[in-house]
Amino acid sequence: TPTHDFMRF
């Protein structure tokens, strides 16, 4: 599960 998916910019 992607935990830092919000940092995938």
From Swiss-Prot:
Its main location: secreted. GO terms for cellular component: extracellular region. One of its GO terms (biological process) is neuropeptide signaling pathway. It is found in: Secreted. The modification Phenylalanine amide is found at F9. Keywords: Amidation, Neuropeptide, Secreted. It comes from the Eukaryota. Belongs to the FARP (FMRFamide related peptide) family. This is FMRFamide-6. It comes from Sarcophaga bullata. The lineage of its organism: Eukaryota, Metazoa, Ecdysozoa, Arthropoda, Hexapoda.
